[in-house]
């Protein structure tokens, strides 16, 4: 039961973050993979069936919306973010 509650909490946080920062569907896909994987940009791009350049554009958009400057900064920001 605890695992289901944890999953619900994490999904609720993700959805609140998405809403708060007005993320597009593709930005959500990118963020989910960045959160769940420490793979290289090339591998993540392949998993999303997009080019590395496209992935970098989505990451830049996420950084702009969250006022972060890097992949690591984005992840740190997400994990420390508190729902308003």
Residue ranges of each PLM-predicted region?
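Basic, Lys/Arg-enriched C-terminal extension of HTH/homeodomain DNA-binding domains
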Residues: 3-4, 17, 60-84
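Regulatory hinge/linker segments at domain boundaries
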Residues: 6-26
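Pre-recognition alpha-helix immediately N-terminal to the DNA-recognition helix
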Residues: 28-32, 73
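Short helix-to-turn junction characteristic of helix-turn-helix DNA-binding domains
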Residues: 34-38, 78
């Amino acid at each position: 039961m605890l695992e289901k509650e944890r999953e619900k909490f994490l999904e609720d946080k993700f959805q609140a973050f998405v809403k708060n920062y007005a993320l597009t569907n593709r930005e959500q896909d990118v963020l989910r993979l960045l959160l769940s994987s420490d793979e290289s940009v090339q591998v993540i791009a392949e998993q999303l069936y997009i080019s590395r350049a496209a992935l970098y554009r989505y990451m830049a958009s996420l950084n702009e919306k969250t006022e972060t400057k890097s992949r690591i900064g984005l992840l740190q920001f997400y994990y420390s973010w508190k729902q308003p």
